[in-house]
């Protein structure tokens, strides 16, 4: 095999490895539910890992911060239920933040 063919194969293999890593990336997920006077949200990642000690924020529809809490050791963030419409955001710092609107939250 000539040196140029080996170089092309080496570059092709390295490119395939680098670009295939993106396939294995994980993205943030969050599911929220209502339990009486509380809203609970479980934050995590698509690979099944938990999001422990991450900030989760609640905003009203005018984008005013209502509350911010940290996820616990179970990846659960707990809020007091707001009388107004709201949305909750989990921003893990990479990929896109996850947003759950109050109309999407049902009783557990």
Q: What do these predicted regions represent?
A:
Residues 55-68:
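Short amphipathic beta-strand segments in non-cytosolic proteins
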Residues 52-54, 86:
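Short beta-strand/loop motifs in extracellular/secreted proteins, especially
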Residues 43-47:
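Short solvent-exposed capping/turn motifs at the termini of beta-strands
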Residues 70-79:
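Glycine-centered loop-to-beta-strand initiation motif
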Residues 2-14:
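Bacterial N-terminal signal peptides that target proteins for export
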Residues 16-24:
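C-terminal segment of classical bacterial N-terminal signal peptides
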Residues 84-96:
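Short, aromatic- and glycine-rich surface loops/edge beta-strands on solvent-exposed regions
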């Amino acid at each position: 095999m000539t040196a140029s063919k080996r170089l092309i194969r080496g570059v092709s293999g390295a490119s395939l490895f680098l670009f295939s890593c993106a396939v294995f990336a994980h993205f943030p997920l969050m599911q929220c539910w209502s339990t009486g006077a509380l809203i609970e949200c479980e934050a995590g990642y698509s690979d099944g890992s938990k999001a422990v000690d991450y900030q989760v924020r609640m905003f009203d529809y005018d984008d005013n911060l209502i509350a911010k809490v940290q996820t616990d050791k179970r990846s659960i963030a707990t809020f007091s239920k707001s009388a107004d419409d709201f949305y909750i955001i989990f921003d893990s710092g990479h990929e896109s933040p996850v947003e759950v609107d109050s109309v999407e939250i049902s009783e557990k």
